[in-house]
């Protein structure tokens, strides 16, 4: 029977993953809080102490730092000497290590964090196990991101968990531990950047970098322009998160943390034209992110508009020369890699909230058409584009989109019909190919009725209201195609 060690700080999906491993004939070992959760879920799991024959000591500071653990992980199974030594010491082979680390970055992001709290959240045993397993990737599977659980299970079931895939997991581990160590260094060096002021001039502010990863705002390479302001940093982060959702050439414009225009196209120039056309007024003074290299042709378009920040994975030399003619525009070069394990946190009085980022995308095949009329292909494309955008809009949020751009956005309203009114009134076009997208369900049929009055013929929304049928009946009355996704996307 194969053996796996599970010791995770981020408990997302761990119970389901552990259950699946037991069904695949893995014997599970765990520590502390992870073991408690698995015990409560009735998942067969043993304590790591059963491997080490040594108890956890010093409030859990020492639990996996033991030859019985690391010998089982590091043994080269192609070397008889290693296997003989394991046998002599009664050490079992470990086939899988599933570990993510104490939340150091989240802990030190709290401005009131104490030195003792920071120190207690420096993980020692976790990185040691991860690095040992990653070093021995030819024989051991190591998982640091919950997002990889499903792929690992699929490969275990179809016998395709090969060395090449284990090597890809190994790379993720060393990237993760490098970022983790860098965050520790930055914190204790006091690596913070004083900003001119905060959200408003009367507020002082500084920027603490807990990572220097190239796919983050903190790790961005600034090629030109003034120091980023507090508001620039927040808006740039929101813009970057949204543009990363698109595989096709895409452009995103953001003002005050809300997208004002999103466009896609066969080329980046087309995508930006669509984003600009979506709201040519609000883009003034905004942040623009692009997911392809900026060419001279696109740079000319960008140069003609007042923008605070332009983000892209690359700028050609000629494009830079054009854009640098404006001395104040900030140009940021950022890797467009998506970090599937990102978390976000918000400070509140006396503490802070931590949650996974809302990156889940419902597959089209899991969405349900609930009306008598089904969407056309073009309406489906419009819905799916809008559904990528709506999680980035403050709730209550209503988006109107076609298959190439947003055409109207109603953000941050206290009631849904109010958000719909704004989106419909500001729409640059409404026709049979435009879809209305809602981040939450309709509590009654009034939003659908309003959409019908403006000529909307396709709606996508989460569903889940006790009065869903009222909205469905209203859609049927007006010949509107409605799709429900089963997943909402509130943003506060």
Swiss-Prot record:
PROSITE patterns cross-referenced by the UniProt entry: MGS (PS51855)
EC number: 2.1.2.3, 3.5.4.10
Annotated MGS-like domain residues: 1-144
Record-level Gene Ontology MF annotations: IMP cyclohydrolase activity; phosphoribosylaminoimidazolecarboxamide formyltransferase activity
Entry-linked SMART domains: AICARFT_IMPCHas (SM00798), MGS (SM00851)
Signal peptide from the UniProt entry: none
Protein encoded by which gene: purH
Source domain of life: Bacteria
Pfam families in alphabetical order: AICARFT_IMPCHas, MGS
Residue pairs linked by disulfide bridges in the UniProt entry: none
Involved pathway(s): Purine metabolism; IMP biosynthesis via de novo pathway; 5-formamido-1-(5-phospho-D-ribosyl)imidazole-4-carboxamide from 5-amino-1-(5-phospho-D-ribosyl)imidazole-4-carboxamide (10-formyl THF route): step 1/1; Purine metabolism; IMP biosynthesis via de novo pathway; IMP from 5-formamido-1-(5-phospho-D-ribosyl)imidazole-4-carboxamide: step 1/1
PANTHER family linked to this entry: BIFUNCTIONAL PURINE BIOSYNTHESIS PROTEIN ATIC, BIFUNCTIONAL PURINE BIOSYNTHESIS PROTEIN PURH
Any single GO CC term annotated in Swiss-Prot or TrEMBL for this entry: cytosol
Catalyses which reaction(s): (6R)-10-formyltetrahydrofolate + 5-amino-1-(5-phospho-beta-D-ribosyl)imidazole-4-carboxamide = 5-formamido-1-(5-phospho-D-ribosyl)imidazole-4-carboxamide + (6S)-5,6,7,8-tetrahydrofolate; IMP + H2O = 5-formamido-1-(5-phospho-D-ribosyl)imidazole-4-carboxamide
Swiss-Prot/TrEMBL domain comment: The IMP cyclohydrolase activity resides in the N-terminal region.
Protein name: Bifunctional purine biosynthesis protein PurH
Protein family per UniProt: Belongs to the PurH family.
């Amino acid at each position: 029977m194969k053996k796996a060690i599970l010791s995770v700080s981020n408990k997302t999906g761990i119970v389901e993953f552990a259950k699946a491993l037991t069904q695949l004939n893995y014997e599970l070992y765990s520590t502390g809080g992870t073991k408690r959760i698995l015990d409560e879920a009735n998942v067969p799991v043993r304590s790591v102490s059963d491997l080490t024959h040594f108890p956890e000591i010093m409030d859990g500071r020492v639990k996996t730092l033991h030859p019985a653990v690391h010998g089982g992980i590091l043994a080269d199974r192609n070397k008889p000497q290693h296997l003989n030594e394991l046998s002599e010491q009664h050490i079992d082979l470990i086939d899988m290590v599933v570990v993510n680390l104490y939340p150091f970055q989240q802990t030190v992001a709290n401005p009131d964090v104490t030195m003792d709290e920071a120190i207690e959240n420096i993980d020692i045993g976790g990185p040691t196990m991860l690095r040992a397993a990653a070093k021995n990737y030819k024989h051991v599977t190591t998982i640091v991101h919950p997002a990889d659980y499903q792929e690992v299970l699929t490969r275990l079931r179809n016998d395709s968990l090969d060395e090449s895939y284990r090597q890809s997991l190994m790379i993720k581990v060393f990237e993760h531990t490098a970022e983790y160590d860098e965050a520790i260094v930055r914190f204790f060096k006091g690596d913070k950047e004083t900003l001119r002021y905060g959200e408003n001039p009367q507020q002082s502010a500084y920027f603490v970098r807990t990572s220097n990863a190239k796919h983050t705002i903190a790790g961005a390479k600034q090629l030109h322009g003034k120091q980023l302001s507090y508001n620039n940093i927040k808006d740039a982060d929101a813009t970057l998160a949204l543009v990363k959702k698109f595989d096709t050439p895409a452009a995103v414009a953001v003002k005050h943390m809300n997208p004002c225009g999103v466009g896609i196209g066969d080329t980046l120039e087309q995508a930006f034209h669509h984003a600009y056309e979506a709201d040519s007024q609000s883009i003034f003074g905004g942040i623009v992110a692009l997911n392809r290299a900026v060419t001279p042709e696109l740079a000319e378009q960008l140069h003609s508009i007042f923008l605070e920040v332009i983000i892209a994975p690359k700028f050609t030399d000629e494009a830079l020369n054009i854009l640098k003619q404006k001395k104040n525009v900030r140009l940021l070069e950022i890797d467009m890699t998506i970090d599937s394990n990102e978390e976000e946190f918000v400070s509140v009085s006396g503490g802070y909230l931590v949650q996974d980022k809302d990156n889940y995308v419902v597959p089209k095949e899991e969405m349900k058409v609930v009306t008598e009329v089904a969407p056309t292909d073009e309406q489906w494309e419009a819905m799916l584009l809008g559904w990528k955008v709506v999680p980035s809009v403050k709730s209550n949020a209503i988006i109107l989109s076609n298959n190439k751009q947003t055409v109207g956005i109603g953000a941050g309203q206290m009631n849904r019909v109010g958000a719909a009114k704004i989106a419909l009134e500001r729409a640059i076009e409404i026709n049979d190919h435009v879809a209305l997208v809602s981040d939450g369900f309709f509590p009654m049929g009034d939003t659908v009725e309003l959409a019908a009055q403006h000529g909307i013929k396709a709606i996508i929304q989460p569903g889940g209201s006790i009065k869903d049928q009222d909205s469905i009946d209203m859609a049927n009355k007006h010949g509107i195609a409605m799709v429900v996704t089963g997943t909402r996307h509130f943003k506060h």
